[in-house]
């Protein structure tokens, strides 16, 4: 690597809106504010919503199920 051409790679803190602070390294060299992190994201916390699309799937199978049927 060439000397003095790469940006500074320093330790920074990323602060989430939930208050969680993550220490990481970046070339940005200033604190980052996050909207969501692994502590508050619904996928990681297990509080995700399941959308009920069963009616749409059944309707699709009724209309187009004939085309996918094997002979």
Curated annotation (Swiss-Prot):
Keywords: Metal-binding, Ribonucleoprotein, Ribosomal protein, RNA-binding, rRNA-binding, Zinc. It holds the Pfam family Ribosomal_L31. Binds 1 zinc ion per subunit. Its cofactor is Zn(2+). InterPro entries: Ribosomal_bL28/bL31-like_sf, Ribosomal_bL31, Ribosomal_bL31_A, Ribosomal_bL31_sf. Part of the 50S ribosomal subunit. The keyword Zinc applies. Signal peptide: none annotated. Belongs to the bacterial ribosomal protein bL31 family. Type A subfamily. One of its GO terms (cellular component) is ribonucleoprotein complex. Binds the 23S rRNA. Zn(2+) binds at residues 16, 18, 37, 40. One of its GO terms (molecular function) is structural constituent of ribosome. GO terms for biological process: translation. This is Large ribosomal subunit protein bL31. The keyword Ribosomal protein applies. The gene is rpmE.
């Amino acid at each position: 690597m060439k000397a003095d051409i790469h940006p500074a790679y320093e330790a920074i803190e990323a602060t989430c809106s939930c208050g969680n602070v993550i220490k990481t390294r970046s070339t940005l060299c200033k604190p980052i504010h996050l909207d969501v992190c692994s502590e508050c994201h619904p996928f990681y916390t297990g509080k995700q919503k399941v959308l009920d699309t069963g009616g749409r799937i059944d309707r699709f199978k009724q209309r187009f199920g004939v085309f996918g049927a094997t002979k």
